Amino acid sequence: PGQSLNLQDNGIKVIVGQRQESKTWDKAIADGWEPGVSLFPIEEALEKASIICYLLSDAAQIQLWPTVKKHLTPGKMLYFSHGFGIAYSEKTGIIPPADVDVALVAPKGSGTSLRRLFLEGKGLNSSFAIHQDATGKAKDRIVSLGIGVGSGYLFETTFIKEVTSDLTGERGTLMGAIQGL
């Protein structure tokens, strides 16, 4: 919830979509999101949103894609924090329509760290990338979102470079591949 809470604290109107009767729905309520006001079932949130922050695991993004895709109307933005679904679209099937912006902000740390640093008045470095600029405003939109979520510094990349960097860091460092070599 770090990104959504930081955006809200920065004055952005945020709505959250979760599966009802789930732990994530209950957690959203515990985090202060109000059912029917700022918390909605996924499809209702998708319908209402102008920017869809697709912050699910890679596997969950693939599974939910048919539902998300039907709500991507012209001018909306599809926002990611990891580039896998787009970078490997031939495998994932995640191919957005041409009339929406597609971009990412990838904080270089967990949502918990992002939130903690935000509350301390600090920021977490993030990369940003634009896959598709249908509106001519994708860069302005994504940089604004990057600042809003609590990025201390933003550097431009591509979706494929973000995936390569992320997987190298996760697999090579956090999961011990370097130590195993």
Regions found by a protein language model. Name each.
Residues 2-7:
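Glycine-rich adenosine-cofactor-binding loop
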Residues 8-33:
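NAD(P)-binding Rossmann-fold cofactor-contacting core
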Residues 168-178:
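A short glycine-threonine-serine/GTX helix/turn-capping micro-motif
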Residues 25-26, 62-66, 140:
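Alpha-helical elements of the RecA-like P-loop NTPase motor core of helicases
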